[in-house]
């Protein structure tokens, strides 16, 4: 195979003015896969694409996609041969093509599909399709041909540092199963890549061309839609290899951040089974190139995931499932074989055992990634997976049957809990003891209620209302006794020579003696008050007179100023004889009027019963506590000699003389006639007039 590939001459590009036939010759041996050769036809001439595939043993051919000229129709002719022999020259290939079309049918008449209406589709039968079922296996930015290598191309099995094998993509190249973000090809479309013979030509289609198996950005794949591009299996950031994506490329089942994979997206790049730090290959990835069976020093095994790579089954936030069609997708008939890949990641096979020997990456990183792969696989597994059921049964085992040591620990714990539960029981007993006193209190309250019932029964028997009975003498007597004691316990005056207390009881100032000794009584009260309350600021002698005309007024204080012989204030006090007919009334009235005189003579204030008067009134009560409180008005009961009574309302009107004419005056309340009540003495005997 290698010799055959080396001896193949490089195809010559036809001139643009002539019609040309482009032959794609694929040869494969055991456990190898050929690569597709694509040529760009002239833009203004009709072109024919010939795809010659030869297979032997377990080999897989690749599909050939050609971009038809923009203004003319193109045709694609596919030649499949099962023999291992291949044509080495351009003339032999053309002759073989003419022999096949011996029925006088020109190549242009076979399988003619206008490119303007719909992209041509080339169907190639391969015995062993790839995991993602893609015919074309190796596109390269520099267009590497598996049989006719270019100056910049590498051998199918011997990759160079900058070259990619038929199964190993370059850094800028994408697998046939992983389309670029800006272009979608089921095999390999690239925005900047051209045909396998031309450095700038694409293997299947240009920016506006569509591959035979994969539509362009504006075309929809049969299975997998993408936001910007649709790939049959996997989109790539820049380009995708047939089986192994590079740093920027994704595997057949691993989409990039912006691309949607059929089942598993990756943050940077995802491999179907083993992602690499810089590149992911379905079987073996290398830093610069990936070989189909031998991985480089920086390459990882198909089962060894990288730190930055995720499993093929782990979905990404921006990735879409292969079964979900895009808005621009049309075909929904061909599903992606994602379950096969998941089963390969879960079930160990002989190939995985061989690959594990080649995995030299650290076990810690691989174990971490393996955990992520298991998560992805479990998500993609169907509900009838045989491996998922044993895990559920194992989880149920500890609940159904507990081991002996666990039972012992639970028994110990139960015993501990019993000891812990005991104190609350004691507390409950304590609380019961606490609850008992309220019950006793309830009984006490019942005892208290019973006397009330007895009292109610008593009130029923007594004709007196229960309100009066409640106000029984037993309650009033102590209070009344206390009040009487307070009255009897009048404080004594500390002023020496004070005689104001019990003045009305003295014989000297009572009865007929009061009329003879009333002037002496008034002068003694004035001197005592001037000395104790006013601090002798009042004059020694003050005019205090008697007024017999004031019928209801007890006293009167007249204040003013005198300008002759010199300016001075003066005050004059008058006491009504008809109201003040006892020694105690003369005393209280005189003290009241002396407060007015002191406020004017000492302070020079005319405020009637204002603050100055109140000051002296409070001071007099403070110094002489035995005196009654000095107030503004008196409440004395006037002793009239003559009373007139209304015949209607029985109201009485007092008079000192019999001067009221009952024929002229009537009662003010009821307008009834007035009648004079006969005079009586103090003992109640009637006084008979002497006239």
From Swiss-Prot:
GO BP term (any one): protein-DNA covalent cross-linking repair
SMART domains: SprT
Limits of the SprT-like domain: 522-677
Bias (Polar residues) ranges: 48-63
Biased composition (Basic residues): 467-488
Pfam families reported in the protein's UniProt record: SprT-like
Tissues expressed in: Expressed in germ cells of the testis (at protein level). Detected in skeletal muscle, liver, kidney, pancreas, heart, lung and brain. Expressed throughout spermatogenesis, from spermatogonia to elongated spermatids, in normal adult testis (at protein level).
Main location: nucleus
GO cellular component: a single term: PML body
Location relative to the cell: Nucleus; Nucleus, PML body; Chromosome
Presence of the UniProt keyword Nucleus in the record: yes
Acidic residues composition-biased segments: 124-333
Entry's Gene Ontology molecular function annotations: SUMO polymer binding
Annotated segments matching region Disordered: 25-488
Subunit details: Interacts (via SIM domains) with SUMO2; this interaction allows the GCNA recruitment to DPCs sites. Interacts with TOP2A; this interaction allows the resolution of topoisomerase II (TOP2A) DNA-protein cross-links.
Role according to the record: May play a role in DNA-protein cross-links (DPCs) clearance through a SUMO-dependent recruitment to sites of DPCs, ensuring the genomic stability by protecting germ cells and early embryos from various sources of damage. Can resolve the topoisomerase II (TOP2A) DPCs.
Name the record gives this protein: Germ cell nuclear acidic protein
Species for this entry: Homo sapiens
């Amino acid at each position: 195979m290698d010799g055959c590939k080396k001896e193949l001459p490089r195809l010559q590009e036809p001139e643009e003015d002539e019609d040309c036939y482009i032959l794609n010759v694929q040869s494969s041996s055991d456990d190898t896969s050929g690569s597709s050769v694509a040529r760009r036809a002239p833009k203004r001439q009709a072109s024919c694409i010939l795809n010659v595939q030869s297979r032997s043993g377990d080999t897989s051919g690749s599909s050939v996609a050609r971009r038809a000229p923009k203004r003319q129709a193109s045709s694609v002719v596919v030649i499949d041969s099962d023999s291992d022999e291949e044509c080495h020259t351009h003339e032999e290939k053309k002759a073989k093509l003419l022999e096949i079309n011996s029925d006088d049918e020109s190549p242009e008449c076979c399988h003619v599909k206008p490119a303007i209406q719909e992209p041509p589709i080339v169907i190639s039968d391969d015995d062993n399709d790839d995991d993602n079922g893609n015919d074309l296996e190796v596109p390269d930015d520099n267009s590497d041909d598996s049989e006719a290598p270019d100056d910049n191309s590498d051998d199918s099995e011997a990759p160079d540092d900058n070259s990619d094998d038929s199964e190993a993509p370059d850094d800028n190249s994408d697998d046939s199963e992983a389309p670029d973000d800006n272009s979608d090809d089921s095999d390999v479309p690239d925005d900047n890549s051209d045909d396998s013979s031309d450095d700038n030509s694409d293997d299947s289609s240009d920016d506006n061309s569509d591959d035979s198996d994969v539509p362009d950005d504006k075309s929809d794949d049969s299975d997998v839609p993408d936001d910007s591009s649709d790939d049959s299996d996997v989109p790539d950031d820049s380009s995708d290899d047939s089986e192994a994506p590079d740093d920027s490329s994704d595997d057949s089942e691993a989409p990039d951040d912006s691309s949607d994979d059929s089942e598993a997206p990756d943050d940077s790049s995802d491999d179907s089974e083993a992602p690499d730090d810089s590149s992911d290959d379905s079987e073996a990835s290398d830093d610069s190139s990936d070989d189909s069976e031998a991985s480089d020093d920086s390459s990882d095994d198909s089962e060894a995931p990288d730190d930055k790579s995720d499993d093929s089954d782990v979905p990404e936030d921006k990735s879409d499932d292969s079964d979900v069609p895009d808005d621009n997708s049309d075909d929904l008939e061909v599903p992606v074989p994602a379950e096969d890949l998941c089963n390969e990641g879960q079930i160990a096979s002989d190939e995985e055992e061989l690959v594990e020997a080649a995995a030299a990456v650290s076990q810690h990183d691989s174990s971490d990634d393996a955990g992520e792969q298991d998560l992805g696989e479990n998500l993609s597994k169907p509900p009838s997976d045989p491996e998922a059921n044993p895990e559920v049964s194992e989880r149920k085992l500890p609940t159904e049957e507990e081991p002996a040591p666990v039972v012992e620990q639970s028994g110990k714990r139960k015993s501990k809990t019993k000891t812990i539960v005991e104190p609350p029981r004691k507390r409950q007993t304590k609380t019961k003891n606490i609850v008992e006193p309220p019950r006793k209190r309830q009984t006490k309250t019942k005892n208290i209620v019973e006397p009330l019932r007895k009292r109610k029964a008593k009130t029923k028997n007594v004709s007196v209302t229960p309100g009066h009975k409640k106000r029984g003498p037993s309650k009033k007597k102590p209070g009344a006794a206390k009040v009487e004691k307070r009255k009897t316990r009048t404080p004594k005056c500390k002023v020496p020579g004070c005689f104001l207390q019990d003045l009305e009881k003295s014989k000297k100032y009572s009865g007929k003696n009061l009329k003879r000794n009333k002037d002496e009584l008034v002068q003694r009260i004035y001197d005592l008050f001037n000395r104790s309350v006013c601090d002798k600021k009042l004059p020694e002698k003050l005019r205090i007179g008697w007024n017999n005309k004031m019928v209801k007024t007890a006293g009167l204080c007249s204040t003013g100023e005198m300008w002759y012989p010199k300016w001075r204030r003066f005050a004059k006090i008058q006491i009504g004889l008809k109201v003040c007919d006892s020694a105690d009334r003369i005393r209280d009235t005189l003290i009241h009027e002396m407060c007015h005189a002191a406020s004017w003579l000492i302070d020079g204030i005319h405020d009637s019963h204002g603050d100055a008067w109140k000051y002296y009134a409070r001071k007099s009560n403070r110094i002489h506590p035995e005196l009654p409180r000095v107030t503004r008005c008196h409440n004395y009961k006037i002793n009239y000699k003559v009373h007139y009574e209304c015949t209607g309302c029985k109201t009485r009107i007092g008079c000192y003389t019999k001067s009221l004419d009952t024929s002229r005056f009537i009662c003010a309340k009821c307008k009834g006639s007035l009648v004079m009540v006969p005079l009586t003495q103090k003992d109640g005997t009637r006084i008979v007039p002497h006239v």
